[in-house]
């Protein structure tokens, strides 16, 4: 005669199956979370680098020779916002540059923005980006402070593909 109920053996088998499934799912969720941080990080890098490139195109100069269209039209502020190579002097310059020419009235605004805000580094959780100057070596560990030619993370971690995030 069989009684309805759960035996100890059935409970142990069920518990073992649940533990095996959980041990497989946990590493997959960690990899998935890291991958989503990498995607967000890569997008922030693209946005900031595109903003730097647009700034360079508009405020380009070679020493005292003004080359970029906004640099030519805003001679008074050109040397204040761009380095001798035409790159922004700081990352904050990408948040807004005050236009001094008549173009400000044509555009209807006196501020030219390249970024809406400075994004947080998803790898560190802070806006602690590190920079590289135009004249710095590609593997430079310190920033010269003259301009912002490139941005990188402060994180020393390795990516899922085995490269360092700093090298992205």
Labelled PLM ranges:
Residues 1, 19, 31, 84, ...:
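Short, flexible active-site loop motifs that bind/organize anionic cofactors or intermediates
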Residues 54-168:
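Low-complexity, acidic interaction segments enriched in glycine
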């Amino acid at each position: 005669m069989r009684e309805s109920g759960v035996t100890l053996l059935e409970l142990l088998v069920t518990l073992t199956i649940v533990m095996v499934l959980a041990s497989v799912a946990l590493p997959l969720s960690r990899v998935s979370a890291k991958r989503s941080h990498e995607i967000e990080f890569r997008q922030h890098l693209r946005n900031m680098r595109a903003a730097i490139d647009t700034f360079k195109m508009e405020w380009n100069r070679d020493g005292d020779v003004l080359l970029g269209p906004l640099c030519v039209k805003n001679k008074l502020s050109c040397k204040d916002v761009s380095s001798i190579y035409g790159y922004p002097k700081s990352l904050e310059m990408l948040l807004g540059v005050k236009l001094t020419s008549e173009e400000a009235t044509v555009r209807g605004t006196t501020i030219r923005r390249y970024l809406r805000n400075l994004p947080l580094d998803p790898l560190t959780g802070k806006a602690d980006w590190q920079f590289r100057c135009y004249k710095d070596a590609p593997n430079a560990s310190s920033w010269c402070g003259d301009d912002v030619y490139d941005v990188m993370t402060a994180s020393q971690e390795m990516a899922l593909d085995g490269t360092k995030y700093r090298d992205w």
